[in-house]
Amino acid sequence: MSTAPAPVAGLRWRPITAQDLTDWHGLVQAIEAADDPAERYTREDLHDELLDGSWKDPARDSTLGIDDDGVPRAFGHVQVLPGDVRTVRAFCWGGVHPQWRGRGVGRELLAWQERLGREKIAAARPTGPGRVLVNVDDGHTATERLLDRAGFRRLRVYLELTRPLDVDVPAPSLREGLRLVPYEPSLSEAVRLAHNEAFADHWGSEPRDRENWERQSVGGRYFRPTWSFVVLDGEEVAGYSLTSAYEQDWAAQGYSAGWTDLLGVRRPWRRAGVGTALLAATMRALREDGIERADLGVDVENPNRALDLYTGLGYRESRRSLAYGKDV
């Protein structure tokens, strides 16, 4: 696998270890304070990013830039999820302390991430398409310029939407034969399979295997079953909404919110009001728990006109993020 980034600005590089979590979190907090990202990371989040998953190997997947005083000043991480079948994706994440920017650190870090991403993609599947991906909040022009100069292309624009809950919330309504039920663990596998089917026509989506699903969706620490719902037609899953509470984001965004991570409707049940009923149920559950808003994200180019559904229910844009990529 790829060697560490080249020496730059006096930093020495080594993999991130579990013993680095506290110092690494301090670095991430300094970056967040400067950049005001949509997502905030707790120390536990960093532990999971580094170690939670059988496919993860921090000695291979991560790097930490240490200054002469032993203080972390930059980091990088590359992840290829198991189970990609259409396009193998390498997700790159990293950052540079605000006081260490403008010294070429980010450029070298990105070059290392691309090299490692290419190697991990080739190891996962020697033939077939792959893509190295970097997400960035809209308006971070320095990062966008860095990506442009490295040959990455802007591939997608994602909107983050918010909906206040102190105004009228519609009642869930479904045609005869469909049932809206709260999510429960016994539905996990059926919902996973429904999700893989529902998202098969979405750009950049790949099937979720059981481990990834249980660790990062319905088994995650932020997942809230009481805010999550499933629509059944007999015993078949027609649609689902899975919502989480990312409380570490609330102070920065200025309100409490439930974030709908996944909303999907299988093709035979589209245009039947299933998505509307699921979101209505979610909003009502959030309001009953005293939550101020319902939030979610959407691809501007969603093939099923999801944005029309959301705006019709009162969701409005709050911020944007961009997906940059390079096909390999």
Located regions from the model:
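Short amphipathic alpha-helix that is part of the acyltransferase structural core
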Residues: M1-L50, P172-R208
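Acyl-donor-binding surface of acyltransferase catalytic domains
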Residues: M1-P5, V80-E176, L322-K326
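A conserved beta-strand-loop-helix scaffold within acyl/acetyltransferase catalytic domains
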Residues: E32-K56, G76-V85, W203-L263
